[in-house]
Amino acid sequence: MGKNRLDLSALDLKLLAMAAMLVDHMGYLLFPTAMWMRYVGRLAFPIFAFQIAEGWYRTHDREKYTLRLLICAVVSEVPFDLAFSGTPVDAGYQNVLWTFFIAAAALWAADALQERLRLPLPLAALPAAGAGYLLGEWMQADYFGPGVLTVLVFALCRQWHIGRL
């Protein structure tokens, strides 16, 4: 470990994010007045968003990666709706895995535009990011359009060697 540097592995980040998310969900469901638990939970999303961007670049099969996110989003929606709205289907708010699926689909679209039109990545990412943002807003996915953009920003930073595991 370097001086004044905290070295965390991908596993360390996942465990930290899962712990933060657990504290958040326990606060929401069991201790609704303990706002500090919700604040701790806010740490989870950017860590998971970073991990999704990293996973996109590290996977050997991006199509399967994106499909797995979609399957997890669909499978987890009913338990999410039951836990957070008390009904099996709540079209007004979707779980965070939808946000990550939309982001992966936008990354896939940006890659396709870059390859087919031979555009630099920032130009190819613009229409994909716009579409992802709008879809996140329309679906009312957790963290909405800005959540989708968060994953895309982490992915672009990785492309530009600004941060990676």
Residue ranges with predicted function:
Residues 1-165:
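Alpha-helical transmembrane segments and their immediate juxtamembrane cytosolic regions
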